[in-house]
């Protein structure tokens, strides 16, 4: 075989005289690394480069034994930041993912030179070319440097567009003015809060427009006005097989709630970066487990109950899978575990409620106390068991009777009654349904209840239930 051809050297190195000191490799600017090629990915992806920056955020691996952090740090081009230029096209910030690197983690404010491979991290399964990713550097070496001018946070007065956020990726930013918590659905699981600029929450599309294309367009507008405040942890705090649940939440505590509608003010800069397919505000240090590091203050009060006319009080209450039939009695049924690794709720079973009698007693006690405290005359219930649909019983009202009995036992007398199921029910129902309960001394049902069946509800929602009521005008007569 022919001998292998010797690799050619770059022109600068090939012309170098023997014994001559070689020049240090040229530094590549962070903005050059962030310059996209095809799509949003860096044009230098998979190449090894060397760059210089100021450390603006640090997330050391193993900082907290109970929480998995981001395991890296963020750098920004020295002397950059300050006034936001909405027309800028590339970012001056970059995430450095330490991973298995044995290099020492620098501290916030350090000036460093990092040599490593350019990578794109999506953080979601089944990522496609359109999935938002994070440009990052996987380091081979990290060297202390000098002559780094400090960086300034870029002030933001709202949620930038996607292209603008791409040009601010991994940069230090300071959101200005007041923001509002518009969703906290993911707070208990991932420690995040969904924020929108201003003082008002965003409304669900179908509260404003009709379902369909108009609602889809409205939700897209809402998404463009929303960004999550993260906690720099990737731990699922509800996974009790891990130990994240033992740590304090970043933005939530007893006596200090983070309710939808509460206002948020940023007191410290954060990093704008892409995580799990979307942009987020990331604190410069892990705040999960360390709430004193929070970059925000949260203020708000629950609005007072409005004064309204009328003498009949109607309420709605989601009993969250109230099942008097228990998972422990269903063959093969497993459960979701609590922090003590005991089954509490059914998992992938015909039933969906409490797994054990103790878990059911805990659930029932809370629901009974809440409904009796609300003190409504009529309560529409959601997510109460339908034993017929699950095949457990022929008594469609079995769980409903159980709840009413518990309410009356707590009240000390026969205060509550339930509206019986109508004689005609849909052939295809879910194992949870809707129901009505009412106070017998205040109101009475008129005729039978009616379930409005339609194929549109099958597999998507519970069929609506309607019941006419009339108030009882005195102790002995209905009027």
Protein language model regions, located:
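Low-complexity, acidic Ser/Thr/Pro-rich repeat tracts that form intrinsically disordered stalk/linker regions
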Residues: 2-26
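Extended non-catalytic accessory segments flanking core domains
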Residues: 19-345, 363-365, 443, 452-463
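Conserved hydrophobic/aromatic pocket- or pore-lining residues that grip, position, or stack substrates
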Residues: 270, 318, 379, 437, ...
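N-terminal, active-site-proximal structural segment of metallo-dependent hydrolase catalytic domains
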Residues: 285-433, 471-473, 477
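A well-ordered secondary-structure block
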Residues: 428, 433-477
